Amino acid sequence: MSKPIDMALFLSGVLTGSKATQQRHLRQARIMQAAIQQRWQRDNPWTWQLKHLRWFLTQHLKDNTDATRYYYRLTALLLWKRLGRVRELLM
């Protein structure tokens, strides 16, 4: 079994904002990574598809507040930006 990808290194090129914001994005990205790994056995964001992030945002977070879901959406957009797939979200 391979070692999970280091999210801090993975997101280092797209993380902006204050230190607290960066830490929140990293924490949330690791939570997303763990949930997607548990559901689909994909711990590497390079193998993720849009359906994985949509599942996380709609199903995994369905019992969370709107504010929580909003902040996770921001983190998901950062992940998608890092993957170079932003155009897929627009279509």
Located regions from the model:
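Short terminal alpha-helical segments
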Residues: 1-21
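Non-catalytic DNA-binding core/recognition domains of DNA-processing enzymes
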Residues: 15-88
